[in-house]
Amino acid sequence: MGSSFAAGPGIPDYYEATPAPCYRSTQNYAHQVAARLELALTDVSCSGATTAHLTGPRGSIPPQLDALSPDTRLVTITIGGNDLGYIGGLTAASCAGLQKETGVEANCSPPITLPAELTFNNLALRMDEIAKEVRRRSPEAQIVFVDYLAVLPETGACSATPLDEFAADGARYTARRLAEITRKVADDNGASIVTASEFSKGHDACSTEAWMNGYPRPEAPVNGAMYHPNAAGMTAVADALEQLLR
């Protein structure tokens, strides 16, 4: 369950039972691991999901936690980025950056400010509540939090990430806080964690061996969803999750 970093938008093919806004790939990490370990999978991940969509509905889409039962034995969770405006902020800043660089007008979204401390604190509380509710509904399940792959290099930027220094550093700060929150929630609730944020360093959108799509440019279109894992990135997460479970 979780957001687009669990669902895999832009990675073919889409799961036939996917509601329109969710874009669940048959090659997302949950599907890959379920196939390798011969597990029965219920995939409720959904692009654009926030923590509120795990506990409550998203339009006609039921709460993701409703997929749990006492018989559930494994729950994977990637969530939190949308609560912080993480990828949305990166996209808006990149649109503005490319417009400034090229002089070509673009229909950019308004800039998203760095999350306030209260926003980070509220996310930590909501993620903790989710972990506890998973435990209540599925007491025998192994809970695994999977955090977000690195989008940007540890310093600087590149043509695939047209960001000024302020925007790039702000995104890195948000990513670091999200990883820290995820780790603490997992530790506090006896859950396991796959630290994609760590092992994906060096495979960011600027890397020659990128696991992450960058921002599309006229001369360099993106084959997939911008600032989201590509097929290699999703497989790397699946490999790490499989290693944890074996």
Please state what every model-predicted region is:
Residues 89-118, 150-175:
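Serine-dependent acyl-ester chemistry module
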Residues 1-47, 65, 93-98:
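Serine-esterase "nucleophile elbow" of acetyl-processing enzymes
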Residues 149-246:
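Catalytic His-Asp segment of secreted/periplasmic serine-dependent ester chemistry enzymes
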Residues 32-40, 125-144, 177-195:
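A structural motif corresponding to the C-terminal end of an alpha-helix
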Residues 71-111, 119-120, 126-133:
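A substrate-binding/cap region within the structured catalytic cores of diverse enzymes
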